[in-house]
């Protein structure tokens, strides 16, 4: 439970909890008996209450084999996505004859907990890209810093700066193209790189760098 909130908190995503239940009008769509389903659904309700989390109930949203707690994330455009999920499965273990040995040395049926924190990597990345609109936080950005040179006279100094950044495990790119510095800056901003470092002859002479963040 805690890992879900920690994981999505790092991504600055607000979560809403949904208790996904059977469709009471169509019990034939689900595996197992009604008693097991009632027990599993009530256990998930208790988990939500114990954690003092507001939740909504969604009949018909359960998997065909189990009820579940779905964590719904809201992206920067206000759209809702199901991300993490916790399922209490009382049906599949029996179908695979899964048992454990209880305290009396006897075989006993088990209940299986399915937990998907992130789900598929591809789906998670699509949600996170939409959420940040490409402007990833510094720690998540594929390129954290981009070095822009004013001319080729400053390349030696620029490479010294790059070496220091790479030694500090900062993901860095180097733009030493024969283009105007204005164009390089505009392209860096369009790429939504957190920090642009601009190096000209003034910076070389002073042994400094000029830093421009994504906000401009």
Language-model features: locations:
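NTP/phosphate- and nucleic-acid-binding module
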Residues: 1-216
């Amino acid at each position: 439970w805690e890992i879900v909130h920690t994981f999505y908190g790092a991504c600055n995503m607000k979560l809403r909890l949904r208790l996904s239940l059977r469709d009471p009008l169509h019990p034939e769509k689900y595996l197992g008996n009604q008693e097991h389903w009632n027990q599993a659904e009530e256990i998930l309700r208790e988990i939500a209450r114990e954690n003092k989390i507001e939740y909504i109930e969604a009949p018909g949203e359960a998997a065909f084999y189990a009820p579940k707690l779905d964590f719904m994330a809201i992206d920067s455009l206000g759209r809702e996505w199901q991300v993490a999920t916790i399922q209490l499965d009382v049906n599949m273990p029996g179908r695979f004859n899964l048992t454990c040995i209880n305290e009396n040395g006897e075989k006993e049926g088990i209940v299986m907990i399915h937990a998907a924190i992130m789900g598929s990597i591809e789906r998670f990345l699509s949600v996170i890209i939409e959420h940040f609109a490409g402007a990833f936080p510094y720690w998540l950005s594929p390129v954290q810093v981009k070095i822009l040179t004013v001319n080729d006279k400053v390349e030696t100094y620029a490479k010294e700066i790059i070496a220091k950044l790479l030694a500090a495990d900062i993901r860095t790119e180097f733009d030493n193209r024969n283009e105007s510095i204005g164009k390089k800056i505009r392209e860096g901003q369009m790429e939504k790189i957190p920090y642009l470092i601009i190096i000209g002859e003034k910076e070389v002479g002073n042994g400094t760098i000029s830093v421009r963040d994504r906000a401009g």
